[in-house]
Amino acid sequence: MISHTAPHKAVVLARGLGSRMRRAAEDVALTAEQSRAADAGVKAMISLDGRPFLDFVISALADAGFTDICLVIGPEHDLIRDHYDGVTKQRVRISYAVQAEPLGTANAVLAAEEFAGGDRVLVLNSDNYYPAEALELLHEVPGSALVGFTREGMLKHSNIPVERIAAFALATADAEGNLA
């Protein structure tokens, strides 16, 4: 039976191959640290302002009240494990679930089944940043929920090119906010 109390656990999917990231982009210079993460195919470990991007994701989760984090990684992702095993964590506990092969999102979530137990969990990708305010809303919702952004909001407040906005997943909600 699944608990209906506010979740304190988050599953962060960090198993992707990063195959698109491994291709060189024109006019983009990477630091040695960024190159190492790119070569390993671990997008979440690309350095931003001297810290892995995943640090910002975990910090936002902690700010929103999530205390137990499970990173779903591949067996070859020592870069992630070495980093988080080597840093002091004051606001969160980090554990790992290994997805042996990259068989998709549902399989990655399944890899974290033991971590979830009977508790509610938040599931998010390691290479997407959600503001703590959005995560707080998910923390407080009594049932299932997702974060969605309006097309207008994406156009106005993101750095995503207009032509890519149409390529994103589209969710439709009814007047009460239920997925339609």
Residue ranges and their predicted role:
Residues 1-123:
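Conserved N-terminal catalytic core of the sugar/cofactor nucleotidyltransferase
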Residues 126-129:
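The conserved acidic donor/metal-binding loop of glycosyltransferases
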Residues 131-180:
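Conserved core of the sugar-phosphate nucleotidyltransferase
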